[in-house]
Each structure stands twice: as structure tokens, then as C-alpha cells.
Amino acid sequence: MTLDNLTHHFLIAAPSMPDERFAQSLVYICRHDRHGVLGLVVNRPIFDTQVGHLLDNLDIEVTDTSVMYDTPLDGGPVYPEVGFVLHTGQPTWASSFPISENVCITTSKDILQNIAAGSAGIGHYHLCLGHASWHEGQLEKEISQGDWLVSPGDLSLLFEIPFEERWRHAAEKIGVHLDFLSDEVGRA
């Protein structure tokens, strides 16, 4: 696998991850280009609030009651006050761009209004507060040091597997049993 473009891939934190902010995290890479990497942690629910409460704070009326109790995610340590909507569907919103054929990231209020109303066109979604980012070459270095494992993107893992199972499930999907992973990284 080449590390040139990890867009629509997962980063699986190694058990020996030195940065506690990412311990046992699963990060979905939304953008990887010559400027760096932007990703969203997709297995850290924020249980002390609900999407409905956050939308209410933005003066967005929630008419779809199922949205009221959806759980937002801690998307990462950078700009935790900024919301990112990771969703299936097409990039038809004011500030939206595609990640893969059927996954987009959107930061505009119009998608939040549609989520609140239960409108069609969104499918699965996660409201992530904050994001993770790496400057040019930083992530590649962390991968070579053994801090991260890499796995191809998978809609089921992204939207259907329970949050608490995602980290292990992602590793097992690439044949890695995290309990047996060595803390040492070497080269032959």
C-alpha cells in the first residue's frame, strides 16, 4: 500500500500509541494531499450531549425526533468547537466535498437543517466536533514509527459497527489481533 494518498482509509491507533489523545482511536481520513492530512476520529462518542441539543444551540429546530438523541463524536483535538458532518450521499450542500464515491464531509449549516428535519439525501451521518490533522510528512513518519496501522475505508465500519467495537474490528479486518501486536518496530 502506498502512503501517497490515504483519503478514504482508516488509521488504527497501535496499542503503543504515544499520544494519549489518540489511544485506541480509529481515524477516518477525509483528505490527504501535499498540504497534509485531515481526519475525523469515528469511535469516540460524546455521551454527555446529543445532536438535538447541539442543533438547538444553533437555533435549528429539530422536527425529526430520532435526531434528538443521536450521539455526536469527538472528531479530534483540533478546533473542537467546529462541527464536521461526515455523511453518505452526494456533496450537494453549501460547503461540502466528496471523500469517496458515497462519502462526503460537510461543514455548512444547511446540512444540519436538513438533518434536523429528517430530509432525504443524507443517509448515514456522524456529527463530529473537532478534527485531527497532520502537516506534510508528519503522518507518514508516525506510520513508519508504528504508531498507526492503515486499513481501506469501509462504509459498514464507518456507520454501522458500534463505536466501542470499531477499533478492534478495523484491526481484525486487516488480520491484526491488537493483543498480540508488538510495541517494537523494526526493519529487516
UniProtKB/Swiss-Prot annotation:
Single GO cellular component term: cytosol
InterPro entries documented for this protein: AlgH-like (IPR003774)
Pfam families, alphabetized: DUF179 (PF02622)
Gene3D superfamilies linked to this entry: VC0467-like
Family to which this protein belongs: Belongs to the UPF0301 (AlgH) family.
Name of the protein: UPF0301 protein PsycPRwf_0144
